[in-house]
Design a protein with these regions (language model features):
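Conserved glycine-rich cofactor-binding loop
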Residues: 7, 14-16, 38
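Conserved glycine-rich Rossmann-like NAD(P)H-binding loop of the short-chain dehydrogenase/reductase
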Residues: 28-45
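Substrate-binding pocket helix/loop in short-chain dehydrogenase/reductase
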Residues: 99-100, 107-112
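The beta1-alpha1 cofactor-binding region of Rossmann-like NAD(H)/NADP(H)-dependent oxidoreductases
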Residues: 39-40, 62-73, 105
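Active-site loop of short-chain dehydrogenase/reductase
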Residues: 6, 55, 84-85, 130-139
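A short, exposed helix-loop element centered on a Lys and neighboring polar residues
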Residues: 123-124
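A glycine-rich helix->loop->beta "capping" turn
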Residues: 53-57, 76-88, 96
Length: 139
């Protein structure tokens, strides 16, 4: 159990690579907080993982990753409940399969808000606790 009692936040953890990462981290003993675009998606993923790891500490949250204040508040709550974040996995992201000349500014903003601003916001929020402790891993 290489990650025993480590606190990991995994963005985009309700499906795909993020879900598989949460599964692996739980198997290694980590306490996992996964984020999803909706609370319902987060809770569904948590339920599935709890079936496999009934004694694990796992939670789902759905902050607006494009909002630093929303991310900070969610991370503060998680830190108060589970401890300082040891590992942040920046996995959330979106893409659009739209021809460039049909790409709208709104679509561009949506992609940039999650794929760039979201990574900045989650990294900034996690780093606050990590820097104070002098340790942590951000992926």
């Amino acid at each position: 159990m290489r990650l025993k009692d480590k606190v990991a936040i995994i963005t985009g953890g309700s499906r795909g690579i993020g879900y598989a990462t949460a599964d692996k981290f739980l198997g290694e003993g980590a306490r996992v907080i996964l984020t999803a675009s909706s609370q319902a998606s987060a809770e569904k993923a948590v339920e599935r993982l709890k079936e496999k790891y009934p004694d694990a500490i796992i939670a789902g949250i759905s902050p607006d990753l494009a909002s630093l204040e929303s991310v900070r508040e969610a991370f503060r709550s998680a830190t108060e409940k589970y401890g300082c974040v040891d590992i942040l996995v920046n996995n959330a992201g979106v893409s659009e399969s739209t021809p460039f000349m049909e790409y709208t500014e709104e679509t561009f903003d949506k992609v940039m808000d999650l794929n760039v601003k979201g990574v900045f916001n989650t990294t900034r929020a996690a780093a606050e606790c990590m820097v104070a402790r002098g340790t942590g891993v951000i992926l």
